[in-house]
A protein has these predicted regions:
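Charged docking surfaces used in two-component/phosphorelay signaling
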Residues: 15-23
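Acidic, metal-coordinating helix/loop segments flanking the phosphotransfer/catalytic sites
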Residues: 30-48, 91
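Active-site residues of response regulator receiver
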Residues: 52, 82
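Receiver (REC) domain active-site loop signature in two-component systems and cognate sites
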Residues: 55
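Short, glycine/charged-rich "phosphate-handling" switch motifs in NTP-dependent
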Residues: 99
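C-terminal output helix
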Residues: 106-115
Length: 123
């Protein structure tokens, strides 16, 4: 299936996302913040990036902008998985290049459905 980069400063959230997507057949690599994610994205190609917004060192909006500046990630789906649900933040994410927005806490089936949809995979 897909190679997914999951970015969140919460270890429990990274574990839950990884568990959910691995059980759906995907390979998941975790990063603890935007800087860690950018380093991993430079070393390996991912089919999708799933990132929190509020993180230390580099937030998810900045990460999205930085990834979009890299040719291999210009068209890679980037989903924001966050507690932020305000319209202003969503617009900021979209302007940075985010493909979609999932609000925490998430339903595992919803996460799998959204990931499958943006990757063009059958569910």
């Amino acid at each position: 299936m897909a190679n997914i980069l999951a970015v969140d400063d919460s270890a429990s959230m990274r574990q839950m996302v990884s568990f959910t997507l691995t059980n759906a057949g995907h390979q998941v690599v975790s990063a603890v913040d935007g800087k860690d994610a950018l380093d991993k994205a430079g070393a390996e190609q991912f089919d999708l990036v799933l990132t929190d917004v509020n993180m230390p060192l580099m937030d998810g909006i900045t990460l999205t902008r930085e990834l979009r500046a890299l040719p291999p990630y210009r068209f890679t789906p980037i989903l924001m998985l966050t507690t932020e649900s305000g319209a202003d933040r969503k617009l900021e994410g979209k302007a940075a290049g985010a493909t979609g927005w999932i609000v925490k806490p998430f339903n595992p089936d919803q996460l799998i459905a959204v990931v499958s949809k943006v990757l063009g995979l059958p569910r």
